[in-house]
Amino acid sequence: MKINSFLIILILLFISIKNSNGEPEKKFKLITLLAAHVQDLGFNNMVNRGHVEVSKAMKLEDSQAIVVVGYNDTIRILAPLVAVGDVDLVICSSQDHAQACRELATKYKGSSIKTQFLVRGSGEATSNLITYSYNYANANYISGYFAGLYTKTNKIGFLSPGAIDNNNDSFVYAFWYGAKRANPDISFYYYNIGNYLNPDKTVAATKDLLDMGCDMVADTLNDFSTGNTLIANNRKTAMGTSGFPQRDVYGEDVIYSYNYNWFKLFYPVAQSVYSGNTNNTNWYADFNLNETISFFGLSFSFTVPNETLTKFYEELDYLKRTPRLSHPYFCNDLMYEYAKKNHLTMSTNDSTHCLANSQFTRINAPFPGMTWLGNYEITLTEVYQSRPIQIAISSISSFFIVTVLVMMGLVVRFRKNPSIRSASPIFLNFILFGALIIYVGIIIWSSSINSASCNAQFWLVTLGFTTLIGSLVVKNVRIWLIFDNPELKLVKITNLQLVPWVGVCLVINIILMSILTSVGDLREVNAQGIDSLGKYEFMRICKMNSSGASTLYTILAYFAALLLIGVFVSWKIRIVDILEFNESKAIANTLYAISFCLFVIVPLMISPQDKQSEKIILCIAGLFIVTAAVLIIFVPKFYRVYIFGSGGTSDMFYKKKKQSPVATARAESTSKGSSGGGAGSGGATGGSGVKTNKRGNLVSGDFSDDTESSLSEPNKPVKVVAGAVLAEFTDDTISDLDNIDQPIEIITENGQDSNNNNNNEENKDNNIENNKISEEIKENLKNEENNDGDN
């Protein structure tokens, strides 16, 4: 007994030593290529499940499932892995991988690389190439048969990728023929999606089919988007036709589903490769009477009537017992005429009305009774800008348009009033007309977009700003040239001389805008992916190319140059003490308003902005800039007209106020240098009818809209007190001295003749003469203020 036990122990020990010292267990590396991620709950999920089950059954430590899409991706990823030489089997599950895998198999055939490729499709097998296929037509036929039995509305819908992967719509036909065979009264509608995996189109197309009254909708796609849409719409007729056991996930919401069992195909192939077999064959998967090797699994809801199940299984048993090439979708009364019409080849025995096996996947055109709805395209939804904001901007702009028109009328009505005449009515109306154009442009900018409005808004706004700013600048250049004239040279500047300069500004603008329009390709486009739009939403926007953008920047630089000129002119005329002409403060305030807007707008525009927000900011900024400019320039003028009446006098510009230190110092200097009141007492004190400026100098003049000239009487000498500004503004010219031919006698502020200094008697005479001149100025002012001008 002890001997027997000892012998058994020795035998077991010997076996253990033999196994431990023997050849190590053969390693096996498996790679499976997927066309999409496993989350699709469809074809790729089931392929991955087959890969995992094979790895578990064979206890593989080195197996990978890799997602690759298309030929290039397959070559790029797979070729380096195969070149290492340690990959035993590559499963190319999709037809997307087929060409690349076949090329690699051909490349390494007969080489030291022992990798074998299991490729989906047909063709001759080689020592390192195994092909496989499965009866997809059979699965679709029997699914259609169930749909025909179960439908209540007799309307069935279907979705397919369409004419891709050389499949065309042959499987749609198989589904339809199964439904037609079960229920001849059905109506059948189908869309092509264009891809095996496009959930957005699938959902939208399914909804369309439901709206048409279809209660059964199936597909040949890789996911369950169709079924999910039916479930979301409270339909209890979802069908799982993607090869995934959908009922395992959705339960009774799915009425019927079939699933692939890839393990039953992959495992025997992997075992064959593992054993070293190179005598490869083609593999084919289908329903089988032997359930242990049947590729398809079926599942039904408990709500399916027994009568329906009975008819279904009767048809399925018929398919299992009938050779595949004699199945109803190959052989029927419709096939002969269809093949003849579409140039397909029938089988050798035409009397059977069976299509040749190689011709089945060429079926694409619909059979009589199939309604093809075309290639489905999702209808994009247009997103409009906020209607209330659009109405608000348009209403405000319209109000200011009316206001500007009223102002233009008032300028014409009160053109003789010194408050208006001194600012040149023609240029005031130019400024208002520019504002009017901008307001119209803002209305177009805020309205619906088309190619015409895209161009119109840029033209109107740029021309408006050029007219407004150009007129303001040119008008004040005249004041600068007149008063920046220390030598009292003759200066003649008429409106006819100034208006062309505004025209020059406009011509430059027109040239730049013409370039933008011609080369900028400024047009309306339907933009997607902006302003947090949905995937299938769009917004109309104006778009230009890079050349147009460069031109637009040039236009902006041009506007900046005009503004800088305006700043310069404003600074230069600040010294003009005649308030009728000194608009430097108004111009400065206008420029401050524009600058304020720029400081606010530029950071906002640089930061990421929605197109709608950008449009609103630009429109509001335009309204603010133009309105501020108009109010700053015109409100003081109309206010003076209102206070002093429609006639008005030049006195409206002068207010009693404390003299500036400079003016006080000059007045004191004048008093000390004169003997008794002279020019100092008569001029600096601003006696009755005589006005003084900030410097204490005499000011006299009549102001019209377009000319400036000195006071003089024909054929008489003109005596001018040094430091006094003498100007009469008529309709013809603007000059410091009209009668240049007459002798000019200059009298200094000290009352001394420039040709005879230090003569006290002459000083007294000059002071008396200075007072006489002041009286003449006073009388002339009264006469001119009562004299209506034409402009």
UniProtKB/Swiss-Prot annotation:
Superkingdom assignment: Eukaryota
Gly residues bias spans: 674-689
Transmembrane segments: 391-411, 425-445, 454-474, 496-516, 551-571, 586-606, 616-636
GN (gene name): grlD
Bilayer topology annotation: Multi-pass membrane protein
Molecular function GO terms recorded: G protein-coupled receptor activity; G protein-coupled receptor binding
CDD domains: 7tmC_GABA-B-like
GO CC aspect terms: G protein-coupled receptor complex; plasma membrane
Basic and acidic residues compositional bias, start-end: 761-785
Cytoplasmic membrane side: 412-424, 475-495, 572-585, 637-791
Name assigned to this protein: Metabotropic glutamate receptor-like protein D
InterPro entries with a match to the protein in the record: GPCR_3_C, mGluR/GABA-B-like, PnrA-like
